[in-house]
Amino acid sequence: MAYERFTSAITLLLHWRNRLDPYWKLARGDRPVGFLLLLWPTWWALWLAADGVPPWWTLCVFTTGIWLTRSAGCVINDYTDRWLDPHVERTCTRPLVTGTVSPRNALLMFATLMLIAFGLVLTMNQLTVLLSVAGLFLAMTYPYLKRYTHLPQVYLGLAFGWGIPMAFAAIQGKVPTLAWLLYIANILWTTAYDTWYAMVDRDDDIKMGAKSIAILFAELDLVVQGVLYTLMLLTLCLVGLRATLSHTYWISLISAVALIGYQFIIARRREPTACFRAFMHNNWVGMTIFAGIALATTH
């Protein structure tokens, strides 16, 4: 009897695992790099706003909220891209394409994730709650941009960095100039690394009529990348000067320059797999800058 109960429990667990696995993949739970690329800039903001380690509850709310909103963003992105994904090699096996998740269930999942995230935001102050509404608008409208403009990467930067003004609002009750400088730096960074991502899908996107910076600038893509990363680093220099950060921050920026340079070495021939590696490598850039900020604000 005990053995039968054990095998029944294992069978039940495997059944639910198989049922939930497509939803986990839809939310990109199996690909944490997107979460990390969203996490680092928000942590930059939290540590700068608090001038050190932020309050534990605020840190928990923002970290959990980042995972929830990033997952929700992936769900709504796949929902709006279900016309395109079957024709792109990298995305043709996504759950909405294969039918393992229905469009209706995807929308329900998006709504559930966003409601939980909003519930967490409600524990913050009024300004943070108001800013979160703008963040919801950015998250919901981003997936449609690639149909109408060659600059969806810029809009992704607006959406991905919105945790920065929210973090300052939560801790300081205002959004100072420092927050907007950091926000601009993150827009430039996101635009740059998502252009690597767009270079992976460029050929398929051209066939399907989708738009991106990689398509717009064609052979000048690497030049544009260089300009974006340079402007990002210069803006982060302004952040360091305005916040009067110590030498550890400046060391982290120098390290970030080396890491970014390595991306151009990786992707110099524009091969899709190499461009994807360059995209993934930005996790180390974000982490390095965070380490510099965290050490510079340690008292």
Swiss-Prot record:
Catalyzes the prenylation of para-hydroxybenzoate (PHB) with an all-trans polyprenyl group. Mediates the second step in the final reaction sequence of ubiquinone-8 (UQ-8) biosynthesis, which is the condensation of the polyisoprenoid side chain with PHB, generating the first membrane-bound Q intermediate 3-octaprenyl-4-hydroxybenzoate. Keywords: Cell inner membrane, Cell membrane, Magnesium, Membrane, Transferase, Transmembrane, Transmembrane helix, Ubiquinone biosynthesis. This is 4-hydroxybenzoate octaprenyltransferase. One of its GO terms (cellular component) is plasma membrane. Its cofactor is Mg(2+). Pathway: Cofactor biosynthesis; ubiquinone biosynthesis. InterPro entries: HB_polyprenyltransferase-like, Prenyltransferase, UbiA_prenyltransferase, UbiA_prenylTrfase_CS, UbiA_sf. Belongs to the UbiA prenyltransferase family. GO terms for biological process: ubiquinone biosynthetic process. It is found in: Cell inner membrane. The gene is ubiA. Its EC number is 2.5.1.39. GO terms for molecular function: 4-hydroxybenzoate polyprenyltransferase activity. The chain crosses the membrane at residues 33-53, 56-76, 107-127, 151-171, 180-200, 213-233, 247-267, 278-298. It is a multi-pass membrane protein. CDD domains: PT_UbiA_COQ2. The keyword Mitochondrion does not apply. It holds the Pfam family UbiA. It catalyses: all-trans-octaprenyl diphosphate + 4-hydroxybenzoate = 4-hydroxy-3-(all-trans-octaprenyl)benzoate + diphosphate. It comes from Xylella fastidiosa (strain M12).
